Curated annotation (Swiss-Prot):
Protein name: Phospholipase A and acyltransferase 5
Keywords attached to this entry: Acyltransferase, Cytoplasm, Hydrolase, Lipid metabolism, Transferase
Family according to the record: Belongs to the H-rev107 family.
One GO MF term: N-acyltransferase activity
Gene that this sequence comes from: PLAAT5
GO cellular component, one term: cytoplasm
LRAT domain span: 135-249
């Protein structure tokens, strides 16, 4: 049975209209021109004047690209660029080891040890720097005190049990004991002058240095018998260095005393001699 044209239009199958596909927007990174030039700006369909004629998306892309183009790239230092090229070509990198004036100033400002500075000052004044095992002669008023150099500006010497008096002083003469002390050379000097004096090296052969130091350190803090004539500070240090306890200071004093005594005896003898009778 057929349908009338009117009925066909009324009961005909109606399909929804599908809009045609829209064109894909151009990619932001796509560019038809050269690599370093910005993409061409598209005009809006609606006529406008000035900036209004550019779409917001196109304006943002163009401004951002212009900003990137206007910022100059940071150039590396010439030396760094040349060094990088030389390394890429297989050459070895050269490291400069020269010190700058600022580095030298920093090193010179480092404080040196106090003892080392004093020894350097003494060497500058022409005084030889003591070596381990050297004998130190200290010039006191009326006598000489002796010590033996050990290390680090320190010496070993004889001192009375009481620190109020020095060995060799009038008070210590009547004491028969002394203690072996390990002290700084500056503390032993008490402002007196001193010198290195190994005067018996030409008479006796010094012991090996390591043996001298070993013997000396074993005596530290020990109490020994003290005698101005037979066991004073010079006897002590000569015994450690040469193995022979000897004191030329006492020998000279005894010799001078013998000479003086001889002169006195000679004068007395001459005075008691009978005088010849003259006519």
């Amino acid at each position: 049975m057929g349908l009338s044209p009117g009925a066909e239009g009324e009961y005909a199958l109606r399909l929804p209209r599908i809009p045609p596909p829209l064109p894909k927007p151009a990619s932001r990174t796509a560019s038809t021109g050269p690599k370093d030039q910005p993409p061409a700006l598209r005009r809006s369909a609606v006529p406008h004047s000035g900036l209004n004629s550019i779409s917001p998306l196109e304006l943002e892309e163009s401004v951002g690209f212009a900003a990137l183009v206007q910022l100059p790239a940071k150039q590396p230092p010439p030396g760094t660029l040349e060094q990088g090229r030389s390394i890429q070509q297989g050459e070895k990198a050269v490291v400069s080891l020269e010190t700058t004036p600022s580095q030298k100033a920093d090193w010179s400002s480092i404080p040196k040890p106090e003892n080392e500075g004093k020894l350097i000052k003494q060497a500058a004044e022409g005084k030889p720097r003591p070596r381990p095992g050297d004998l130190i002669e200290i010039f006191r008023i009326g006598y000489e005190h002796w010590a033996i150099y050990v290390e680090d500006d320190c010496v070993v010497h004889l001192a009375p049990p009481s620190e109020e008096f020095e060995v060799g002083s009038i008070t210590s003469i009547f004491s028969n004991r002394a203690v072996v002390k390990y002290s700084r050379l500056e503390d032993v000097l008490h402002g007196c002058s001193w010198k290195v004096n190994n005067k018996l090296d030409g008479t006796y052969l010094p012991l090996p240095v390591d043996k001298i130091i070993q013997r000396t350190k074993k005596m530290v803090n020990k109490i020994v018998q003290y005698s101005l004539i037979e066991g004073n500070c010079e006897h002590f240090v000569n015994g450690l260095r040469y193995g022979v306890p000897r004191s030329q200071q006492v020998e000279h004093a005894l010799m001078e005393g013998a000479k003086a005594a001889g002169a006195v005896i000679s004068a007395v003898v001459d005075s008691i001699k009978p005088k010849p009778i003259t006519a």
